[in-house]
Structure formats: structure tokens, C-alpha cells
Design a protein with these regions (language model features):
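Short, structured segments at the rim of ligand-binding sites
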Residues: 1-425
Length: 425
């Protein structure tokens, strides 16, 4: 094989979703857990710090982090402040865990995090016996006066995010009796599958009834070591880069046995004409030699919405429009991601149409523009991929990638030294 046909080997850090779930499950377990190859980024460090605010002992180890779990919810004698920074997972996963303990906990975060909705979680915790209050907009700051959670039956609006359900499920083994949740209009279902798999790894008993109803039995968790696989959402950027540059890129360790639904993005790339190979050892995407993309299709990315911007950013390079739908909940992430994508594509001279849960991107030549990142790491990374093919792209906040992949820009330059990466990096 020559240089152009030998796949490039991408260095993708550990999954944020797995890292933060495993941190919490280890903290709730009885005993010591070694978490190997965790993602080390702003979001996971914020989650780790929030757990230490709750009294959990976490120390650095050669291969990752050691967590000493207490086998129960946290107990404090005085009001305890918990800093979530920008980490939405901390704001949504940790209050249910705290509610299974004893004491008063006050959760707060950045202005960006204060703008993200928490009302469904607050209402659910109240229904389970917790005393909870939040800001006037149904968001942070959130106060939990904890005295354990009862469990029982619960209907949960899951149309904004699957993270409310995830937080409640992970706390359920610490409740006084079984929890049965009926998730209404559940989005991002693969993240719930991931959560249940990790809960079972740590010894929980959970039954998925297959109709949006899940029952979790009390009984706690037991410590269990875990190695974190590469982040599939992050991998979407280098796999898309392979498609638009005509190269092959392999992500080792992210294969057919992955816990992450976002690996499904590779199959979306297959619809654009890229060659995709998924084995147990890893995933390889190879673009057409000229980097051309086939459009003219619509795709539901509701279950893998963290990757929709990756497709949207490269869609102008296709030969026909591409419509992405089922992503209405992406309007409530770090930014209104549908609107942010549309505005940035318009700045580049690309025509789009959007609806409440969809966006259509038309092909076209892009002009120079500064991308508005809105402090959203995924906007910066997605449009950086387009920048490999489209000259004159700059980012107004290139450092925001530190939320999940601090080394992103360096890795993109390493993989594609013959292509221009966006200026300002």
C-alpha cells in the first residue's frame, strides 16, 4: 500500500458519555474501582470535581483514575455547594444521586448551563419524595434537601433529553424500593442502552420492557474496573474528514461491540458514498479519491443527534441537498444547534431551510467566513472538517473544543498535513 491507500490511524480520546457514567456508578458502588483510559477534558474534569464536592475520593492512577465508592448516596452535615461548570451531565446525573443521600446540596454552573432546562428532572425527583427547588426558569441553581428516595412508578417527559432518565436510572439501585419509569417521547435511545449496560456492569438489576418502560431493582452497586472506549461522537469528525479528503481513517478500539450509538454515524457516511468497514477491532472510513459526496437523501439522526452537525457541516460538498430530521432536541444543547448550523452555513454562502426538528442543506461553493462557535465544542469541530476542503474558514473560539477533545486541532493537523485547517487554530 502507498501513503494514500494506507489508512491513517486516529488517536481518539475516551468516551465522555462512558467516562461520566462510570465515574458516578463507581462513586455509588461499594469498594474501589479503577477507571482506565478515561476522557480527560473540561467536561469530565468538571464532573470529577463535582463528585469530590459530594465527598467522593478520586485519585490519579497510572492508567486513569481510582474511585473509592461509598455504596450509597452522599451524606453531608452542612449545606454543600456542587460546581457543575459547563457539564450538563453533572447537572442532570448528580442531583438524583445526591437525593439518595442525606443533607442539603446546591448545584450550580456556568451561565450557559443555567440556560439549559431541568424542569422534567426537578418534577421527577419531587414525585419520588425529594425536596427540590430550582431557578425561576426551571434550571440551575438547583437545591436538593436529601433524605433518600422512595422509588415507585414514574412518568417522565424525555422529549428534551435522555439525560434526565439516565440520572434517575443510575440512582435507582440506591432507592428504597424498585423504580419503574415510563419514558415519554424518548430521544437518543442508544444512550439509555449504554446506561443500562454500564449499570449492569456494576451489578445493578434492570429490566427494559421494550416500550419505553424500564424497571430497576434496589440493591446497590459493586465496584468493577472498566476501560473506556474511544468517543464515537468525537470520532465522527475524523471519519467525516476521511470522506471529504479521499483518505482512509481507522479508529481502533471503536468497533462492532461498542456501547455507543453514535458509531451509527459511520453508516450515515456510507450513504454519502464513503466506504465503511466496522470490525470488532475498530472502524475505518475511506472517502472517494476525489472526496466527492452523494446527497439527495433524508436521514433521521434523532438517536445520534450529537453527530448531526458533522454531517450538516460537510453537506455543502454533496451533489444534492441533504435533509436531517428528528433532531428537535438539539435546540436545547450547548446552543440551539439547528439555528447555529443554519447561521454559520449562511455566512459561508450556503442555502438552508429549517423546521422545528429538521434542517435541509443545499450544495454550493463556500466563501470565507468566521464561524460563530457559541462556546459549543461540536460546532467548532464540525466546521473544522469542512475547513479541510473550504478555504478561508476561521473559528471565533477554537479553544472551546477543550470541553471534550483538547487535542482536536493538533490531531486534525497530524492526520491531514496536506490540507489547510481553519485559521485561528
Amino acid at each position: 500500500m502507498n501513503r494514500l491507500t494506507t489508512p491513517l490511524i486516529a488517536r481518539i480520546p475516551g468516551s465522555k458519555s462512558i467516562t461520566n457514567r462510570a465515574l458516578l456508578l463507581a462513586a455509588a458502588s461499594a469498594g474501589d474501582t479503577r477507571l482506565s483510559a478515561p476522557l480527560i477534558s473540561e467536561d469530565t474534569l468538571a464532573f470529577r470535581t463535582a463528585l469530590t464536592d459530594l465527598g467522593i475520593r478520586i485519585t490519579d492512577a497510572d492508567t486513569g483514575w481510582d474511585i473509592r465508592g461509598g455504596g450509597r448516596g452522599p451524606t453531608v452535615g452542612a449545606t454543600t455547594s456542587v460546581a457543575c461548570a459547563d457539564a450538563g451531565t453533572a447537572a442532570r446525573f448528580l442531583p438524583p444521586f445526591a437525593a439518595t443521600g442525606r443533607g442539603e446540596f446546591v448545584f450550580d454552573g456556568s451561565d450557559q448551563l443555567r440556560a439549559r432546562p431541568l424542569r422534567p428532572l426537578v418534577d421527577a425527583l419531587g414525585a419520588l419524595g425529594a425536596r427540590v427547588s430550582c431557578g425561576p426558569a426551571g434550571a440551575l441553581p438547583l437545591t436538593v434537601a436529601a433524605d433518600g428516595l422512595d422509588g415507585g412508578d414514574l412518568d417522565l417527559d424525555s422529549s428534551f433529553s435522555s439525560q434526565y432518565l439516565t440520572g434517575l436510572l443510575m440512582a435507582a439501585p440506591l432507592m428504597r424500593r424498585a423504580l419503574t419509569v415510563r419514558a415519554k417521547a424518548l430521544v437518543s435511545r442508544p444512550y439509555i442502552d449504554m446506561t443500562l449496560a454500564l449499570m449492569r456492569h456494576f451489578g445493578a438489576t434492570a429490566e427494559d420492557h421494550g416500550d419505553g418502560t424500564i424497571t430497576v431493582r434496589p440493591g446497590g452497586y459493586r465496584a468493577a474496573d472498566l476501560t473506556v472506549e474511544p468517543d464515537a461522537s468525537t470520532a465522527s469528525y475524523v471519519l467525516a474528514a476521511a470522506a471529504v479528503t479521499g483518505r482512509g481513517v481507522t479508529v481502533p478500539g471503536l468497533g462492532g461491540t461498542s456501547l455507543q450509538g453514535d458509531l451509527g454515524f459511520a453508516h450515515v457516511l456510507r450513504r454519502t458514498g464513503a466506504h465503511v468497514a466496522v470490525t470488532d477491532a475498530g472502524t475505518t472510513v475511506t472517502g472517494r479519491p476525489d472526496g466527492s459526496l452523494t446527497g439527495g437523501f433524508a436521514v433521521d439522526m434523532g438517536d445520534i443527534s450529537d453527530t448531526f452537525m458533522t454531517l450538516a457541516a460537510i453537506a455543502p460538498l454533496a451533489d444534492a441537498p441533504i435533509t436531517i430530521h428528528g433532531i428537535g432536541h438539539a435546540r436545547f444543547k450547548e446552543s440551539d444547534r439547528i439555528e447555529a448550523v443554519a447561521r454559520n452555513l449562511a455566512a459561508l454562502g450556503i442555502r438552508t431551510e429549517q423546521g422545528p426538528d429538521r434542517i435541509t442543506i443545499h450544495p454550493g461553493a463556500t466563501g470565507p467566513a468566521e464561524i460563530a462557535c457559541y462556546r459549543d465544542h461540536r460546532i467548532a469541530m464540525a466546521f473544522s472538517v469542512l475547513g479541510l476542503r473550504a478555504g478561508g474558514i476561521t473559528l471565533d473560539d477554537p479553544s472551546c473544543v477543550g470541553k471534550t477533545f483538547p487535542g482536536f486541532h493538533a490531531e486534525l493537523r497530524r492526520l491531514f498535513p496536506d490540507h489547510t485547517t481553519p485559521q485561528g487554530i
